[in-house]
Amino acid sequence: MAQAKKGGTAAKKGQKTRRREKKNVPHGAAHIKSTFNNTIVSITDPQGNVIAWASSGHVGFKGSRKSTPFAAQLAAENAARKAQEHGVKKVDVFVKGPGSGRETAIRSLQAAGLEVGTISDVTPQPHNGCRPPKRRRV
């Protein structure tokens, strides 16, 4: 007869779970990746380590509602709130992608209480690299 396994937890015995420590980072960088389907906001320290992040899907939107400017606004506010718990007061913004939530996310970072320094567009431009997807015919 097969022995019945006892239900275990996600953390195994003897394995340490990583405790999230509060960092004190006054100046950081906000990376906003806005695609046609989603918007992801990551706030990092000057070395590039992620302090806080949020996305339209993480905030609770599904499907085509993730690509709306309102979803990007809520994601940016959520990420800014988490970053302020770590002491972030000023951010430089790096925006990437062609999505609709770019400007809204920057505005909501300011409205959430973060001081925005520089705004840079770091959208990758191909030097005739991969073939783009075919045109939509609706």
From Swiss-Prot:
One of its GO terms (cellular component) is ribonucleoprotein complex. SUPFAM superfamilies: Translational machinery components. Signal peptide: none annotated. GO terms for molecular function: rRNA binding; structural constituent of ribosome. The keyword Ribonucleoprotein applies. Residues 1-32, 119-138 are annotated as: Disordered. One of its GO terms (biological process) is translation. HAMAP family: Ribosomal_uS11 (MF_01310). Located on the platform of the 30S subunit, it bridges several disparate RNA helices of the 16S rRNA. Forms part of the Shine-Dalgarno cleft in the 70S ribosome. Part of the 30S ribosomal subunit. Interacts with proteins S7 and S18. Binds to IF-3. This is Small ribosomal subunit protein uS11. It comes from Mycolicibacterium smegmatis (strain ATCC 700084 / mc(2)155) (Mycobacterium smegmatis).
